[in-house]
């Protein structure tokens, strides 16, 4: 069988991989096999960490809300605050509550005092 050189197609594929791996360090940015493996690994990590990022932010928001609610003893804890919010049908998500807790603590105290009544 004759040898197929695949010049243009192979070069285009390798160029695409090299462009992706241009910011990698060492051989991972220069050698095609190493760059291909590193590219697959990078994509796996990116996919995994997109899910982890959602969990991390939710955890951060909960920590911030809990810190502010315990600070002045407005509500006893985060869980009671959230329970009372749902009971009163106030649809504020954790991201918004965390922003309020950081930027305007008085507003969060007003909200929680209204809920307790």
Swiss-Prot record:
Classification via InterPro entries: Ribosomal_bL20 (IPR005813), RIBOSOMAL_L20_CS (IPR049946), Ribosomal_protein_bL20_C (IPR035566)
Compartment(s) of residence: Plastid, Chloroplast
Protein name: Large ribosomal subunit protein bL20c
Assigned keywords, A-Z: Chloroplast, Plastid, Ribonucleoprotein, Ribosomal protein, RNA-binding, rRNA-binding
Disulfide bonds: none
General function of this protein: Binds directly to 23S ribosomal RNA and is necessary for the in vitro assembly process of the 50S ribosomal subunit. It is not involved in the protein synthesizing functions of that subunit.
One term under GO cellular component: chloroplast
Keyword Transcription regulation: no
Example GO biological process: ribosomal large subunit assembly
Family label: Belongs to the bacterial ribosomal protein bL20 family.
Main subcellular location of this protein, as a coarse class: plastid
Any GO MF annotation of the entry: structural constituent of ribosome
Positions of transmembrane segments: none
Species in which this protein is naturally found: Acorus calamus (Sweet flag)
Cited Pfam families: Ribosomal_L20
């Amino acid at each position: 069988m004759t040898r197929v050189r695949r010049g243009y197609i192979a070069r285009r594929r390798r160029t695409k991989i090299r462009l992706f791996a241009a910011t990698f360090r060492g051989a991972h940015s220069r050698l095609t096999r190493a760059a291909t493996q590193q590219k697959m690994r990078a994509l796996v990590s990116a996919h995994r960490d997109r899910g982890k990022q959602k969990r991390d932010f939710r955890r951060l928001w909960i920590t911030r809300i809990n810190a502010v609610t315990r600070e002045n003893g407005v509500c006893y804890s985060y869980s009671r605050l959230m329970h009372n919010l749902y009971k009163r049908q106030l649809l504020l998500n954790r991201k918004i509550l965390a922003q309020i807790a950081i930027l305007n603590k008085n507003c969060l105290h007003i909200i929680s005092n209204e809920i307790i009544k």
